[in-house]
Amino acid sequence: MASSSPDTTTLPFLQFPPEVRLSIYQYLIPDLPIRNFSLLRDRSKTIHLRHDGSRCCPALLRANHQIYAEVIQEWYGSTSYEVVLDTKYILFCGKVIPPYVPLPSTIQWVQSMRLCLSIQGTPRHIHSQSTLEHLLGFQDRLTTLAAALSDKGYRKLGRLQIDIGVNIPLLLSLSKTPSELLELLNWNLLPLRENVRDVADVRWELQEQSYGIQSEEFQRSYAGMKSIMCAFLQDMRLDMLERPDG
């Protein structure tokens, strides 16, 4: 924190008992799920992040070392935070974080996270240099996020909801066989599976996208691939879950 922060002895607020201060903080922090696109779209408007319609007070996090230490867990533990992982950026708290840029340390304080990503092709499917650069940027964002959430000594993550976008025609064009599908899933998800462990609650959901009326053959092909994908994701979930003592 900046050296200009007021000294704790000059703040009468800190003379209140800790439980009173915590009660006050509850009226000044978000309690609605934090979604990135609404924050990005409505920058010119007042964003309401509380059920009661009142404003939050992020200035609390800059007020004082002690207040920061008390508020930070409440601020990032009171609601669910969405993280969007794209080929060009990560979105977190309405901020666009491009590849090869460190993530904000506050992401480790998030207790409930909704992670949104879409299945991408692997580099061997790509012939365009610019598309390859985007894919490598996606891989950097993925591994950086996984690393940030891997340290059980610092992270506070207790619930992880993974929403996985699947472009069905693209998926079938990239994976003709079960082994190709598993290669594709590993490329997109292995950093999370290997590094983010011992989370109390892990869930996943497929967000399927298709276009037009599909033939029965198309539907059968996808049904077979979907069963493999669901088995992979269930195994991944079990790997990431917290293991009971003993």
Predicted features along the sequence, with ranges:
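N-terminal Skp1-binding subsegment of the F-box domain
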Residues: 4-47, 51, 58-66
